[in-house]
Amino acid sequence: MMCGFTSNPSPKKLLSKSSATNVHLEISPVKPDRPCKGYENVLGSCTTVAKCADLTDDLPVHNKENLLHGFNDLERHHDEENSSLQDSGYSSILQNDSPCQDETDSNVSDIQVRDTPKNLMQYQKPFHTLSTRCLPILRFEAAMCSTLKKMRKTSKKIDWNAVDDVVCGGNYGLEHLIGKSMGLERVDILAELFHRDFKHLLTKILRHLNAMDLINVIGVSTTWRKILQKDNWAYNTYKLGCKELCEKRAKVSTHTATRDESLCRVPLASVQKVAASSLCTSKKQNKNGGLSNNRHAEFIEVAQTLKNDQSLKACVDCGSPAKYDSYLHRAICTRESCKLDFCTLCSCKYHSSKSCLISKPRSYRIPIEPLPGSKKSKQNLRRL
């Protein structure tokens, strides 16, 4: 990387260059020296150069008399410097006892002072401009630092109540910070948009939902209900969806006796309950009649396949016809899904040779004394 700093050339080098240019000018004109491209980028806003850096700025290039006059001035300046200076380069800058220091210090100071990074920072704009001061986090940071400094002067301990007062009291606008909800497992995006008054975004989101989705949305929370009620289009579609759903459910189920089944209630709900109860009872009666007819037909079909020692009995579990053996007190259900083999005395599973608890003979209590009025009591009286 090339440095943009240019030191004052020595008078000997200037004379050699001037003589070379004089010889060259007699043959053809000389092109003016141009600075390198990266020189302006390095210096930035500082564009000052030494006074004797370029002779072609004030004088025309093709005027030989002016050029010769300029070179004569350089020779005089060279004679004055030779009396006090023996070397060239940076030593002329570092020497403090030379009489021509006052003239060179002005040029050198212009280059040195403005090229240092500290002085370059002075010409740059400060970081905390008006736009950055309006940022909420910087305002909050400044307030917290000032309070903590004051607390540090009085006591070493931190008073968290004072910190809470600063946080709650100042209107810093921290609720508008981006990324404050990062790290949370669940974030209510619709509620955040509603609190920040982004109505145009909420309307775009609600336009992508159908009637059933809006019915589910309104039951999530009160904030979502408010969002839906404030949007006219979404609320109207929600109402139409509710009506269509009620009509569909009314077609499927003719009665709406319970509140769970009915989505929206009608003012004459008590009259509907009375009508629904009568319909339910009539339906139950019809169902029972139909079941009895079917069961009778089943018994007739099974009776045709019975043997001489068999009869029919109803199954204990399902009520279907079961083939009964009166000698073994055993019955087997004819239904394929049941096939229960049970004892007709105890209604339990068939226990073959084991004695049934209910079929045991009853132990009658024999009275010790005869009953009054009986034959034995009369005989006893005669004996006496």
From Swiss-Prot:
Residue ranges of domain F-box in the record: 191-238
Annotated Low complexity bias: 9-19
Region (Disordered): 1-20, 79-106
Pfam family, one: F-box
Compartments where located: Nucleus; Cytoplasm; Cytoplasm, Cytoskeleton, Spindle; Cytoplasm, Cytoskeleton, Microtubule organizing center, Centrosome
Compositional bias of kind Polar residues: 83-99
GO BP, sorted A to Z: cell division; negative regulation of exit from meiosis; negative regulation of meiotic nuclear division; negative regulation of mitotic metaphase/anaphase transition; negative regulation of ubiquitin protein ligase activity; protein ubiquitination; regulation of cell cycle; regulation of mitotic nuclear division
Processing and modification events after translation: Proteolysed; proteolysis is induced by both cyclin B-cdk1 and cyclin A-cdk1/2 complex through probable phosphorylation. Proteolysis is inhibited by pin1 during G2.
Record note on quaternary structure: Part of a SCF (SKP1-cullin-F-box) protein ligase complex. Interacts with btrc. Interacts with skp1. Interacts with cdc20. Interacts with pin1; stabilizes fbxo5 by preventing its association with btrc in an isomerization-dependent pathway; this interaction is present during G2 phase and prevents fbxo5 degradation. Interacts with plk1.
Role: Regulates progression through early mitosis by inhibiting the anaphase promoting complex/cyclosome (APC). Binds to the APC activators cdc20 to prevent APC activation. Can also bind directly to the APC to inhibit substrate-binding. Required to arrest unfertilized eggs at metaphase of meiosis II, by preventing their release from metaphase of meiosis II, through inhibition of APC-dependent cyclin B destruction leading to stabilization of cyclin B-cdk1 complex activity.
Protein name (database record): F-box only protein 5-B
Source organism of this protein record: Xenopus laevis (African clawed frog)
Gene behind this protein: fbxo5-b
